[in-house]
Regions:
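Active-site neighborhood of divalent metal-dependent phosphoester bond hydrolases
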Residues: 95-99, 107-131
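Binuclear metal-ion centers of metallo-dependent hydrolases, dominated by the metallo-beta-lactamase
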Residues: 176-188, 195-262
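A short helix-to-beta-strand connector/capping loop
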Residues: 3, 97-98, 124-130, 142-144, ...
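Active-site metal-binding motif and surrounding structural segment of the metallo-beta-lactamase
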Residues: 48-103, 186-188
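Core dinuclear metal-dependent hydrolase active-site scaffold
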Residues: 1-51, 55-64, 130-181, 248-262
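Active-site neighborhood of phospho(di)ester-bond hydrolases with catalytic His/Asp-centered motifs
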Residues: 50-54, 70-78, 103-104, 167-172, ...
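Glycine/Thr-rich phosphate-binding loops of Rossmann-like dinucleotide-binding domains
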Residues: 15, 59, 82-83, 199, ...
Length: 262
C-alpha cells in the first residue's frame, strides 16, 4: 500500500524566520525559506497521523486541511515537539473522538508534568486523550507498523520512526549501531541537519552527510534546518545529488511494505 508523508514543518525550535532577525534568510521571499517547527503528517487511505505536535500544530493542520486525525506519535519531550497538544481539542469536538497519543516513557512523564489539567481533572473543554506508552519495539496504529529508531539528542533519548520504506529522524546527534541497522539501505531517509557549524545536540552538514554515506539510502531529505544554514537555494547548492533540503508542505510517497533488504 502506498502512503504520503508531508513535511508539516522543517525548521528549528525557533522557526524560520526568527523574530527580530535581520539576516537575508529570515527576509527571503522564497516560500521554501518559511520553516515552521519540525513535524510530519502520514496519510494512508484510511489513516492520518502526525509525528509530533509542536507550537505550530494548529496552523499546520489548517494548511494541510486535516479534517480527520487518527493519532499523534511523539519523538521527544522538547517544547517544539509537544507544545501544540492543547489544539487537539478541535478533533475532540468536531469528530467526537478521544485522541490516541503514542509516546516513549520520557514524553509520557513530560506531558503529565507540563499539562496536568489534561490528566488530573474533568474540567470542561480540556483535551481528551488516551496516552499509550511505547517501548523500542515496533507497534501498530490501525494497520500501519511503526518501528522506533532510538537516537541521542546530546543526552536525551529521541525516537525516530521507520514506517514502510521511509525513516524519519529528527533531533539526532548520535545514532547507535543498533539503530543504524534498522534503516540501512532504506529507500527514503529524513534526518535533521541544523547548519554547517558543530552543535552539541544536532547533526551539522558534515555529520549528516557522513551518516547518509553509512546508511546508503536511496534518497535523503534534510529537516530541522536553521536560518544560519542559508536559503533553500544556498543549501541545495552544497548538497550531493541524492540529498535534498526539505521544505514545508513537501509531500513524499512511500510504500508501507518493508523490503527484505532492510
Amino acid at each position: 500500500m502506498m502512503g504520503t508523508f508531508t513535511f508539516l514543518g522543517t525548521g528549528t525550535s525557533q522557526g524560520v524566520p526568527m523574530p527580530a532577525c535581520s539576516c537575508h534568510v529570515c527576509h527571503s521571499k522564497d516560500p521554501r525559506d518559511k520553516r515552521l517547527r519540525s513535524s510530519g503528517l502520514i496519510r494512508l487511505a484510511d489513516l492520518t497521523l502526525c509525528i509530533d505536535a509542536g507550537p505550530d500544530f494548529r496552523y499546520q493542520m489548517l494548511r494541510e486541511k486535516v479534517n480527520t486525525l487518527n493519532a499523534i506519535v511523539f519523538t521527544h519531550e522538547h517544547r517544539d515537539h509537544i507544545a501544540g497538544i492543547d489544539d487537539i481539542r478541535a478533533y475532540n469536538y468536531i469528530n467526537n473522538q478521544v485522541m490516541p497519543l503514542f509516546a516513549p516513557k520520557e514524553v509520557v512523564e513530560a506531558l503529565h508534568q507540563s499539562y496536568p489539567y489534561i490528566f488530573n481533572s474533568n474540567y470542561p473543554g480540556i483535551p481528551k486523550v488516551v496516552l499509550n506508552e511505547i517501548s523500542e519495539e515496533s507497534f501498530n496504529i490501525e494497520g500501519l507498523t511503526l518501528t522506533p529508531i532510538p537516537v541521542w539528542h546530546h543526552k536525551l533519548r529521541v525516537f525516530g520512526y521507520r514506517f514502510g520504506d521511509l525513516a524519519y529522524i529528527t533531533d539526532a546527534k548520535t545514532v547507535p549501531d543498533s539503530s543504524r541497522r534498522l534503516i540501512r539501505n532504506i529507500p527514503t531517509l529524513i534526518i535533521n541537519c541544523l547548519h554547517e557549524s558543530p552543535h552539541i545536540s544536532h547533526f551539522n552538514l558534515s555529520e549528516a552527510l557522513a551518516f547518509v554515506a553509512d546508511i546508503n539510502p536511496g534518497i535523503t531529505y534534510l529537516t530541522h534546518i536553521s536560518h544560519l544554514f542559508g536559503t533553500h537555494e544556498e543549501i541545495s547548492a552544497k548538497l550531493p545529488p541524492n540529498v535534498h533540503a526539505a521544505y514545508d508542505g513537501l509531500a513524499l510517497s512511500f510504500n508501507t511494505h518493508v523490503s527484505d533488504n532492510l
